[in-house]
Regions:
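Short, glycine/acidic-enriched capping/hinge loops at junctions between secondary-structure elements
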Residues: 49-52, 78-81, 114-115
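Short, Asp-centered acidic motifs that coordinate Mg2+ and/or phosphate
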Residues: 101
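Cysteine-nucleophile active-site neighborhood
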Residues: 104-173
Length: 295
């Protein structure tokens, strides 16, 4: 199904090299109103994250209008200002038209207390606005922790070592529309140094843990009263993301552990074995269908 993307977005050419011909999906005019999705991209390397999400959203059976949001209170250090000016808009600009769904990405700030993040106040304002004006929001990784803390005072805790790998995860509520078509076990990429804990979530009546891993802990939390989901991992990750991260860290220190359940035979030289892609696509497609249907 066609997508609407900003003209000239680098992700279009990147995905073409992966034999995903986004150009064939692009459209400017259509009789139907597209489902408008806004991605608040908090990651430092914007183009990589843009590509990850467009790759997975390109499987949508519905017409999507993809937009990217930027913060006013924080300037990206790793993405050119020209890119931000051309492809990103503020909340004030984007909120002039109806937004159906919103995705808030992770951010490399989990070692900092929430209140000390330089854009925390603006982020809180965006969270509050989304809750009142967007049909459904997905909070990813650090954003999931930030959303749970902002709305429900759920703390984050440092882990003794990095949670790093592709972890078997159980859908505890298979009847949830988000899990339609899921197997009894799916795998979720994790890359984090902190966690939220079930015992804190269980103290909040409005929250429910709907997916969990024996090894990596709480995986997906939902709001019972709103269409908000807090996902602690990165189902959107490309096949080589953890490999890139592993080799980057290996160049900095010697005590880096190999990501679990990721490489063939646990051998980095043999490359990653992709085990999460189909369920990742299914989860995002279920979310899009639910956003539109408003069940």
């Amino acid at each position: 199904m066609p997508l609407r993307l900003p003209d000239g977005l680098p992700a279009i050419d990147i995905l073409k090299r992966e034999n995903i011909n986004i150009e064939d999906m692009l459209t400017k005019e259509d009789d139907k109103r597209p489902l408008r999705i806004v991605i608040l991209n908090l990651m430092p390397f914007k183009a990589t994250t843009e590509t990850d999400f467009i790759r997975i959203l390109s499987n949508s059976p519905l017409l999507l209008d993809i937009n990217f949001m930027k913060l006013k209170s924080h300037a990206s250090k790793h993405t050119p200002a020209e890119h931000m000016d051309r492809f990103y808009h503020t909340l004030e600009e984007l909120s002039k038209e109806k937004i159906d769904g919103m995705i808030v990405t992770g951010a490399p700030v989990e070692g900092i207390p929430f209140e000390e993040v330089d854009y925390w106040t603006e982020l809180q304002e965006i969270f509050n606005w989304a809750r009142e004006n967007v049909r459904s929001t997905l909070y990813i990784c650090w954003a999931a922790q930030a959303g749970l803390y902002h709305f429900y005072d759920i703390p984050k805790y440092p882990l003794p070592k990095k949670m790093f790998g592709i972890f078997p995860t159980i859908p505890l509520k298979p009847e949830q529309p988000l899990f339609r078509g899921f197997d009894d076990v799916f795998r979720m990429p994790q890359s984090r140094h902190t966690e939220v804990r079930r015992e804190d979530i269980e103290q909040v009546d409005d929250l429910e843990v709907i997916a969990e891993s024996e090894e990596s802990g709480v995986s997906i939390v939902r709001s019972r009263s709103r269409r908000e989901f807090f996902i602690t991992g990165h189902l959107e990750y490309a096949p080589d993301t953890l490999d890139t991260e592993y080799r980057r860290d290996l160049g900095k220190r010697d005590d880096v552990e190999v990501p679990k359940y990721y490489y063939r035979e646990d051998n980095p030289d043999k490359g990653p074995l992709v085990t999460w892609r189909s369920h990742a696509n299914l989860l995002f497609m279920n979310w899009i269908s639910w956003v539109l249907g408003g069940e």
